[in-house]
Amino acid sequence: RSKQIIASMTIGKDVSKLFPDVVKVIRTKNIELKKLVYLYLINYAKIKPDLIFLAVAAFHSDAKEGATPLIRGLAIRTMGCIQVPEVVSYLGETLTYCFKDKDPYVRKIAALCVPKLYLTSPQLVREKDFLNTLHDCLKDENPVVVANSMQALNEISVLSGANQLKLKSKYLRHIVKYHRKTKQ
């Protein structure tokens, strides 16, 4: 039934009235079904902002305690795509511990969510000190996390009109080291 709902949504049919029913499926362990539910929620969150709070706890739980890095990353990516105040406030809190996740996949997704958060709430990005967190990620052991952090800082620079990508020599040495490795 969920696949039918998503198929209807993708061809332009209004299935927003099913929002409460779809939210009930969010706790599924089936990753494919979870992806479909998250896609639906991204699509209809602005239409049903009063109901998105039903999903916020599940996003938060999946991002923090998801069984796999894929689920944790999917949860924060979805939260980043939903520009509704109820989700934005939780995203700030959620990103704080996602940047500390042991898996680089989760950290790279966290980095990419900061510009989305900045678009909606620059004040929250400053309060949570995410610009410094992104700069700290420039020293990450994973080159994809480093690249995504640079991309995020660049996007925020464009959005803010001020250069946020202030590379210190310690960051540059680290970045050059990874650049050499990836060229080989």
Where are each of the predicted segments found?
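Short inter-helical turns and helix N-cap capping residues of alpha-solenoid HEAT/ARM repeat scaffolds
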Residues: 29-30, 66-68, 102-104, 141-142, ...
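Internal, well-ordered domain-core segments that constitute the primary functional module
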Residues: 102, 114-148
